[in-house]
């Protein structure tokens, strides 16, 4: 048997490089692992989700995970702007290729995680709450969002119970604020009732703390930001706010930009005159729902659009922003019999 430490990084990041830069790869080998595995390099197996709520077509999952004798998840305790928490259940998002990861990356994310637990279920979940993240997680650029005095480790065999206890420790009402937990319980995948969970060790009340919630709203975030927003789902809002937070937390990175305008969502009304004059000012048309306005600025297509996430637009021309955006989109993996979602080119 082998001990394999596997992971998949976020958009625009190479997991193999991340293993080297953050030291996890070297630490894993020192600790007795046989190898580390960037999941984007693993062979994919097409799997049907039983009784799906949102993943109605097959998903392609890493063969190594599907065939493992034991799966141990080691999530970092973090607030997530879309799902409130990202603990054991949310780890399954990292098993997906980027097409499936971005798909259903909005209001249906909770149901998606319930579906994923039906095909990938950890035998043990160990939550690292030593230095957890609050606020604009899962990758907040704000230093104050990193909590450096928490020092909690949480572990259990039932990922739903682990997440329920974890959410409670973070100050959430698990059943009412984290729909994936009650969804998993209703589906018979675990226990989300705190009264039915045997918590061993330090009592919850001794470590419980209110973690600041994340926020994906774009209204009033900065005087230079203007938003024309119709019916916009959480996916495009999440990716837009994620990228924008980098500049809100580090104003010097866009000090030469005078105006940033976003057009997004269905049925949005837009003025006849917009100020798109890079690198002084930019208009971003975000997501497929706003495609009718794509000639008004830089069009960032997709559902959800990955929008400002790693776009790094200040100082770039429209053409340079578009090129970087498309280069960040994942290449299709050639899997026989696997039909990928259509993407806007």
Feature names for model-found ranges:
Residues 1-345:
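N-terminal and secondary-structure boundary signal
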